[in-house]
A protein has these predicted regions:
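Conserved short alpha-helical segments that host acidic/polar catalytic motifs at enzyme active sites
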Residues: 1-166
Length: 166
């Protein structure tokens, strides 16, 4: 259940949190500088067809809590991209935030410029990033969520027809 996942995610940190819900045909994003279980109480996630959350310690980037949103995409990322400057030097997107997670979006934008489908986007991003990544990339205009990881810390389950991941 969502409350249990949120409670377990506090182990990752309580410095900041963010929740994405999908309601009335649009995504709603709420961020806070406190733990995710408190934020969950402030959201109307129960009536959403999609609810995703993130909890973290501040490690790389003191602001710009997740999810990171730009160019009609968003990402929730657990890990650290250690070659972020190398990535920024190789893409045409301009950096907007002070978080390494934005590099995942910049790479997704580059990939989608040249490709008609998104089949290999997760592998492309993982091939360009050095560090640890478990992420969900959302492409709302295509109605797609892409899960990918290079460290095995992405867990997926199904309960009563609902997809859960952590």
């Amino acid at each position: 259940d969502v409350k249990i996942l949120a409670s377990h995610s506090k182990q990752r940190g309580i410095d900041s949190s963010g929740i994405v819900t999908f309601q009335d045909a649009k995504y709603q994003i709420v961020r806070a500088d406190f733990e995710v279980t408190k934020l969950l109480q402030k959201c109307k996630w129960q009536s959403s067809s999609i609810a995703m959350g993130h909890s973290r310690l501040v490690t790389n980037g003191m602001s710009d809590n997740q999810p990171v949103v730009r160019d009609d995409l968003f990402v929730i990322h657990n890990g650290i991209v250690v070659n972020e400057q190398e990535i920024w030097d190789s893409v045409s997107s301009e950096r907007l935030f002070e978080t390494d997670s934005e590099t995942i979006l910049a790479l997704a934008i580059e990939y989608m410029k040249d490709k008609q489908d998104i089949e290999g986007i997760g592998q492309y991003i993982l091939s360009k990033c050095k560090g640890t990544i478990s992420a969900v990339l959302a492409i709302p205009k295509l109605g797609k969520l892409i899960l990918f990881s290079n460290n095995g810390s992405l867990y997926v389950g199904n309960k009563n027809g609902a997809l859960y991941f952590a």
